[in-house]
Amino acid sequence: MNLNATILGQAIAFVLFVLFCMKYVWPPIMAAIEKRQKEIADGLSSAERAKKDLDLAKADAGEQLAKAKAEAQAIIESANKQRTQMIEEAKAEAEQERSKIVAQAQSELEAERKRAREELRKQVAMLAIAGAEKIIERSVDEAANSDIVDKLVAEL
């Protein structure tokens, strides 16, 4: 055989092989490659969407945390105001109670003073009556009478 015929035979066999591969082997390989490219592209887009969703979730979580902190601060401030108000009310109530007790003590003291004065008046009246009885019993001169009156005044 000659070298040209061998090369020609090999060239024909190669062309037939290439045609066979293009017709039966190449389309499934290309379909698999395209399918894989599509899966990779879908995976990348899913990853990108997931990243965006994660960023949105982080932002939302940050907003919710800030809102919760603000609400907690408002609750704390409200509780402090309520506590202060309750303390002030308790102080006012205690002051009223103290004033009431002081007023009651003063009225009791005044009543005791009046009772003591009344008792003293009764004693003075008794002394005056006793002194008058002594003066009447002792008919003495005017100097003795004046002396007895001075003693009564000193006793009062």
Swiss-Prot record:
Keyword match Transport: yes
GO cellular component terms attached to this protein's record: plasma membrane; proton-transporting ATP synthase complex
A GO term, aspect molecular function: proton-transporting ATP synthase activity, rotational mechanism
Segments passing through the bilayer: 11-31
Broad class of the protein's primary localization: membrane
Cell location: Cell inner membrane
Record's subunit section: F-type ATPases have 2 components, F(1) - the catalytic core - and F(0) - the membrane proton channel. F(1) has five subunits: alpha(3), beta(3), gamma(1), delta(1), epsilon(1). F(0) has three main subunits: a(1), b(2) and c(10-14). The alpha and beta chains form an alternating ring which encloses part of the gamma chain. F(1) is attached to F(0) by a central stalk formed by the gamma and epsilon chains, while a peripheral stalk is formed by the delta and b chains.
Family: Belongs to the ATPase B chain family.
Protein task: F(1)F(0) ATP synthase produces ATP from ADP in the presence of a proton or sodium gradient. F-type ATPases consist of two structural domains, F(1) containing the extramembraneous catalytic core and F(0) containing the membrane proton channel, linked together by a central stalk and a peripheral stalk. During catalysis, ATP synthesis in the catalytic domain of F(1) is coupled via a rotary mechanism of the central stalk subunits to proton translocation.
Protein's name according to its UniProt entry: ATP synthase subunit b
Organism: Proteus mirabilis (strain HI4320)
Lineage: Bacteria, Pseudomonadati, Pseudomonadota, Gammaproteobacteria, Enterobacterales
Gene transcribed to yield this protein: atpF
